[in-house]
Curated annotation (Swiss-Prot):
InterPro entries: Ribosomal_uS10, Ribosomal_uS10_CS, Ribosomal_uS10_dom, Ribosomal_uS10_dom_sf. It comes from Leuconostoc citreum (strain KM20). GO terms for molecular function: structural constituent of ribosome; tRNA binding. This is Small ribosomal subunit protein uS10. HAMAP family: Ribosomal_uS10 (MF_00508).
């Protein structure tokens, strides 16, 4: 018997918003009777940008900026029709990117 599975990947720059969104998704799926695996924390992507402080000279004086992308993975096993409808109607904060695979 083949199992249906929905895989949801969440990405955000702020981990608090990301965790709140993951909790909303888990709570909604549990309320509609689906099995949940997660939220699983994935490795944080760290991007470092190095720029010169001065516009013309002083090459040794530099400044570094960092951007961290936090990620979570949620698997919903054997979702019901109610689960899919509830997830479509769910509103999440604007700072969270969602990728859904069926």
């Amino acid at each position: 018997m083949a199992q249906k599975k929905i895989r949801i990947r969440l990405k955000a720059y702020e981990h608090r918003i990301l965790d709140q969104s993951a909790e909303k998704i888990v709570e909604t799926a549990k309320r509609t009777g689906a099995e949940i695996a997660g939220p699983i924390p994935l490795p944080t992507e760290r991007t470092l940008y190095t720029i010169l402080r001065s516009p013309h000279k002083h090459k040794d004086s530099r400044e570094q900026f960092e951007m961290r992308t936090h990620k979570r993975l949620i698997d919903i096993v054997n979702p019901t029709d109610k689960t899919v409808d509830a997830l479509r109607k769910l509103e999440l904060p604007s700072g969270v990117a969602i990728e859904i695979k069926l």
